[in-house]
Amino acid sequence: MSATRKAGSAADVAAAASELRVAASRLLRHLRSARAGIEMTPSQAVALSRLGTDGPLSVADLARAERVRPQSMRTTLATLEERGLVTRAPHPTDQRQVLLSLSDEGRRLLTLAHHAKEDWLATAITTKLSPAEQDSLITAIPLLASLVED
């Protein structure tokens, strides 16, 4: 679907969905590579980011939030803990659980990665889009965000 066509028919919406999927995949690939040289798997980056956003979480809560198996999340978190990026603390009311949170180094690394991604994206927006296109993008952001709200 070209930028000049308007959505309306099921075929137009399907074409738009396909183009958006491709563009989103390419954008994510670029953002993942813009980590300022930080060596981290995508699952490690997501877990670190979720802990930075949502604060201390149990393995089960983190796995549920990211829609992965607890065993997979345990493996990811073990690597982050070995690297000194997350810390463990007992749950205040349930002694069977452990809460994980960012260490100071994890917070520093997460901030560094976010800045690198935002710098790349800001540069791409200002160098590749006209002012009118930038306005259109800004207008579309809430619409895109609403597509992924739970």
Where in the sequence are the language-model features?
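N-terminal leader segment of winged-helix/HTH proteins
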Residues: 1-42, 126, 146
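Pre-recognition alpha-helix immediately N-terminal to the DNA-recognition helix
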Residues: 26, 46-52, 108, 135
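Alpha-helical linker/hinge and terminal dimerization helices associated
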Residues: 27, 31-34, 66, 109, ...
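N-terminal helix-turn-helix DNA-binding core of bacterial DNA-binding proteins
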Residues: 30-72, 83, 99
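Short, locally clustered residues in the helix-turn-helix/winged-helix DNA-binding domain
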Residues: 49-53, 114, 142
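Charged, amphipathic alpha-helical coiled-coil/dimerization segments
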Residues: 78-136
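Exposed, interaction-prone assembly regions rather than primary DNA-binding/catalytic cores
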Residues: 135-150
